[in-house]
Regions:
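Primarily secretory-pathway and cell-envelope proteins
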Residues: 24-83, 121-144
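Bacterial N-terminal signal peptides that target proteins for export
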Residues: 1-11
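A short tyrosine-centered beta-strand micro-motif
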Residues: 112-118
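Short, surface-exposed beta-strand/beta-hairpin micro-motifs centered on an aromatic residue
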Residues: 102-108
Length: 144
C-alpha cells in the first residue's frame, strides 16, 4: 500500500511539472500565406513574445514595432500592435500587405532586397533590407 501511494504521488508530481512547463510556453500564432510569402504576427504577452522571439531563428526577417515613451529612468519602449505593414520588392511590386497582430512579425521572403513600410498614427517608417536567408531583426520605433 505504501509503495502504491508513493507511485501515485510521483505520478501526480510529474503530471503537475509537465503541465506547468507546457503552460509556460505559448503556442505560435498561425502562419499565414500571401502569395509566395509566409508570415506570422503576434507577441502580446510575455509568453507569446518569448515564443515568437525563439522562433525568429527560423525566419529570415523579424520585425518589431514600438513607440519610445519617457519613463522616470529614461526612454522605455511601448510595444505596438495593429501596425499596417507593406513589403515591396525593388521593382515596386507589393509582396506582403497586412496589419500586425502584435508587436512582432516573422516573415519568410525569398532572398533579395525589399522596402518595408510600417505605419503608426499616420507616421510611416521605411527600411530598405537585404534578405539573405540569415535571420535579421528590424526595429520600427516611433516617438510617443
Amino acid at each position: 500500500m505504501k509503495l502504491t501511494t508513493q507511485y501515485a504521488i510521483s505520478a501526480a508530481l510529474a503530471a503537475a511539472t509537465l503541465s506547468s512547463a507546457l503552460a509556460l510556453s505559448a503556442p505560435l500564432p498561425p502562419v499565414k500565406i500571401q502569395g509566395d510569402v509566409a508570415y506570422l504576427s503576434g507577441g502580446i504577452g510575455k509568453d507569446e513574445a518569448r515564443t515568437i522571439l525563439a522562433a525568429a531563428k527560423d525566419y529570415p526577417l523579424a520585425l518589431e514595432f514600438a513607440a519610445a515613451t519617457h519613463a522616470k529612468h529614461g526612454p522605455k519602449p511601448e510595444y505596438n500592435a495593429a501596425v499596417p505593414v507593406t513589403i515591396k520588392d525593388l521593382q515596386g511590386t507589393v509582396v506582403l500587405s497586412t496589419t500586425s497582430e502584435g508587436p512582432f512579425m516573422l516573415v519568410k521572403l525569398p532572398a533579395g532586397r525589399y522596402l518595408i513600410s510600417a505605419e503608426r498614427n499616420g507616421k510611416v517608417e521605411r527600411r530598405l533590407v537585404w534578405v539573405t536567408g540569415e535571420p535579421r531583426l528590424l526595429v520600427f520605433e516611433w516617438a510617443a
